[in-house]
Each structure stands twice: as structure tokens, then as C-alpha cells.
Amino acid sequence: MSDNQSWNSSGSEEDPETESGPPVERCGVLSKWTNYIHGWQDRWVVLKNNTLSYYKSEDETEYGCRGSICLSKAVITPHDFDECRFDISVNDSVWYLRAQDPDHRQQWIDAIEQHKTESGYGSESSLRRHGSMVSLVSGASGYSATSTSSFKKGHSLREKLAEMETFRDILCRQVDTLQKYFDVCADAVSKDELQRDKVVEDDEDDFPTTRSDGDFLHNTNGNKEKLFPHVTPKGINGIDFKGEAITFKATTAGILATLSHCIELMVKREESWQKRHDKEMEKRRRLEEAYKNAMAELKKKPRFGGPDYEEGPNSLINEEEFFDAVEAALDRQDKIEEQSQSEKVRLHWPTPLPSGDAFSSVGTHRFVQKVEEMVQNHMTYSLQDVGGDANWQLVVEEGEMKVYRREVEENGIVLDPLKATHAVKGVTGHEVCNYFWSVDVRNDWETTIENFHVVETLADNAIIIYQTHKRVWPASQRDVLYLSAIRKIPALTENDPETWIVCNFSVDHDSAPLNNRCVRAKINVAMICQTLVSPPEGNQEISRDNILCKITYVANVNPGGWAPASVLRAVAKREYPKFLKRFTSYVQEKTAGKPILF
């Protein structure tokens, strides 16, 4: 059949494929996500022979690559929000990469796609070659082995279709024969009528004959048979009209019977396919249900590693999981700190404590005016009682310690001012502020610092410090650059106590610029201490049982980056009271049995 022939020959002719040159090799520096501790690190990346490899640096390529992936089946995904980032995934392995700028990223993506295309998996020419082979095999076999084995009645259907094709040819021949017969008959009748009309016209001029009764008749009957002989059309003497009609009826009956059989076979095939379709739909329903269950279980598991789960407004981790991760990390740090404190013996340097007069002077450094302004603001506003203020919320109360918070947000970033009051027996304000300000003992009581150093010493009572805090995943690591000043504020009257204050506030310095590793936080913190002395009995000397230190601690912190508000407030509520208790206990421990420092 013509249709079958055209189907068999489809796909046998193709345009010759154009050969393209080999893909261009590429190498350069990209930032690669290493892990949640070290974050993004610059790596030397080489694209060659359908393989992407990376080295620690260009100088260390001779030592071998640190990792490589084949790009044949890799999936390259540009990030939705970060214009410089793109991800490459092969099965369960995912590389997170960042370029210098969007144009640089697009160049890398194009080069990787070219290597992937030339590998054969992503090539259109490869797909065309495979498709042509399938078409040729299908054309040679007529029907695929799968379809013929799936339905054995398919042979009967094809046979019936062939029979219908034969019936069609027979019917066409019969119709042509009958049509020819009718055309010849019509031509013969037309010629006969034309001849009769001509003879009648010629006889109109003949004289009539007289009959015995006096009537006149035309004398034309004598030649009637000669004039109008019986005409038989030429070319139809060999046609059996009756036989052709019977055959025509039989052919149409055969076509109807074959059509009926084909319809019956197609109905049976449809029923079989419907059963298969129902089974496949049931399988699909089960698979979708299993997929939903697997995704639900996956969401319950903790997520680690990828930068998509870091802190930020586009983080894939929700607030509850974010808080759980932060809390778990803080608990681990506390356990490590407790273990290290119990195992090691602290080394203490005999730091001479200057007299109070050394900290009473204002100084002459370039930040003198700023320090004086900060000190006066804290002395004016920080010592005010906020217990009855509706804007301040009492979030923690443990014995003498009370912690207040005022909720403030700016551009989605939590900037809650915090204020805590406490009363500690056996220590003076000078001692508390000295231990809080001194960098020699900072690591003894501060457990959140990873490292710190003094950037510049401005005066005996003022220094600039740069410190990096330990990272708490999934939050980004923070660093702080601040000026720390300690001051003694003399009492205005004899009944007023002396006040010691340590003021820490953020500044800028050329020796500690911003870096990509940490988020720079801004702080304004003050530790304000006043010493109250109860007179001893009799003529006894003042002991530590007679002194009480009233502490006011205020903190205004800008975290420098986005994090869930509920998480920040929950962590602050947990960590600030813990810090005050740990620090005051440390001061009590270090001053016990030593002379009182007023």
C-alpha cells in the first residue's frame, strides 16, 4: 500500500551532519562552596575533555586535582537570586560555584554546556542519529517486536486491512467497468435519437397515399426497419452486466463484513489497553504517594552543607528549623567549653591593676570626643529605671537579675535594645569593669570568641579591638571592630557611689577592613557598675561580705545581616542571662581571697 510504503521509508533520508570543532578548554578562578565552616573559597577550576576539575590554587596543579566531575550527564542550574552563582549537579554530587560577575558566570556556563553537548548526551545531532537508526529498523520490520508480541490479534487486524485493500481494488475495477458500460449505452442512445430526428425531417415532403376510406397516409412504414435498425453499442458485447452486478454486491458485502471484524478487533484492543492504562494509573498513584511521603521525611531531616540553607531572606530553611539548628550549635559549644574548662588549668598573668586615677582622665586621642559623648549618653539614659516603661518588656527574671527588651526592627533587621540589671556580692565595680575591659583575661570568660587582637592602643584606658566570633550554623560568621574604653566617674556627692563604666562601640579602622568571610556587626555596649558598702560591725575592716556591686548592662547590636526575628530574640533571651551569670561568677571566683580593689 502507498501509505505503508511512505511510513516505512520515513526517516531514511537525512541531511548530512555538519562537523564542529572540539570545544574550547577553559580555566580560571571560581569561588567554590566547601562546607558550612569555611564557606566560599577561591579555587582554580579547569574545564577540559568534558571534565571539570578544581585545584586549591593555580600553583598547586602539579600536585593533582582535589575533585572532578564528568559533564556528560551534569545539570547546570543558574541561581535564581545570586547573579554570580551557578550549581552543577551529577546524581547526588552538587558543586556550588560563584563567578566574579554575571558575565563571567555566563561564559563558564556556555563553555560547560558546549563540552556537555559534544559529549553526545546533550547533542541534537546525536539524538537525530539515534532516531534515524530506530526509523530504519522500524521500516524494515514493518512493526516493532514489542507491538507484535503485545497483541497476537494484531496479525488478524493487518490481514483484514489487507483484505479491505484488495476489496477496494476489486470494487474500483468493477465501478470502472460499469461506468464504461453506462457511458457507451448513453452514447448509443444519443446517436439513435439523432438519426430518428433526421429521417423524420426528410419524409415531411413525401405525398400521402389514399386509403379506401379516403384517409391519407404517409408511405414511410415500409422502410422503418431499414431506417431504424437495432443498435448495439460497440465495446460492450463482452460485459456480463448481471455478473458484474452480483460481484459488486458480494464485494460490498465483504467490505462490510471485514469492517465489522476490524471494529471488533479494535474494541478488544481498546479494552486491553484500558486495562493496561488502569494498571499504570494505579502504579502512578502509588508512586506519587510514595514520593510525597519521601519528601515529607526528607523535610523532617536536618539539612547541612549547601549555601541555600544559610542565613538570608531566601534561605530554604524555615524559622523553626533555623532556631533548632542554632540552638543545637550553641549547646555543642557550651559542652565543648565546659569540657575544656574542666580539663585545662587556666594560666593567669599577673596583670597589674592601675589605680582609679589613671582611668579618670579623658585623654587626648582622636576618638576622645566620641568616647565622652557615649559615656555621657549612657550615664544619662542607661541608668534610668525601665521597670514601669510600657515600651520595655521584662523577658527574664532570676533572683537579682532582670533582663528587659524593647522590640525594634529596621528594614527587616532586628535591632532590639537590651538592658539587664544585676546585683553581685563580694566584688566592686572597679573589679568587674577591669575584668570586663582587660584583654588579658578575655578568653577566660568569653566563650563565643574565635580569636581577637588589639588593632591600636589609643591610651591607657582606650584600645581598638578586632574580634571574630565562633560561627553558629546556619547563621553566617560575625566579626566586630570596636573601641573599648574604661572610665571612672566620680561621685557628685558624698552619699552617691562612684561609678565605673566600660563603653564598647563600633568604629572603622584601615587595619581591619571588611572581608567576604564574615558579616560585620555593629555594637554599642556598656557595662556600668556602682559599689555599695555596708558599714562593718565595730571597728572591723571592710570585708567582701560588706560590699555589693550593682551592675547595669546595656547592649544595642546590629547583626549586619538578615536572620529570622523570632530566632534572634529567642537566642538573645537565652544567651544574655547566661553571659551575665557566667561573667559575674568568674569575677567572684578570681577576686575571692584577694585585697579589695575600690
Swiss-Prot record:
Its main location: cytoplasm. Phosphorylation on Ser-132 decreases the affinity toward phosphatidylinositol 4-phosphate at Golgi membranes and reduces ceramide transfer activity. Inactivated by hyperphosphorylation of serine residues by CSNK1G2/CK1 that triggers dissociation from the Golgi complex, thus down-regulating ER-to-Golgi transport of ceramide and sphingomyelin synthesis. InterPro entries: PH-like_dom_sf (IPR011993), PH_domain (IPR001849), STARD11_START (IPR041952), START-like_dom_sf (IPR023393), START_lipid-bd_dom (IPR002913), START_lipid_transfer (IPR051213). It catalyses: N-hexadecanoylsphing-4-enine(in) = N-hexadecanoylsphing-4-enine(out). CDD domains: PH_GPBP, START_STARD11-like. An N-acylsphing-4-enine binds at residues 446, 467, 504, 553. SUPFAM superfamilies: Bet v1-like (SSF55961), PH domain-like (SSF50729). The modification Phosphoserine is found at residues 126, 132, 135, 315. One of its GO terms (cellular component) is Golgi apparatus. GO terms for molecular function: ceramide transfer activity; phosphatidylinositol-4-phosphate binding. Interacts with VAPA and VAPB. Interaction with VAPB is less efficient than with VAPA. Interacts (via FFAT motif) with the MOSPD2 (via MSP domain). This is Ceramide transfer protein. The lineage of its organism: Eukaryota, Metazoa, Chordata, Craniata, Vertebrata.
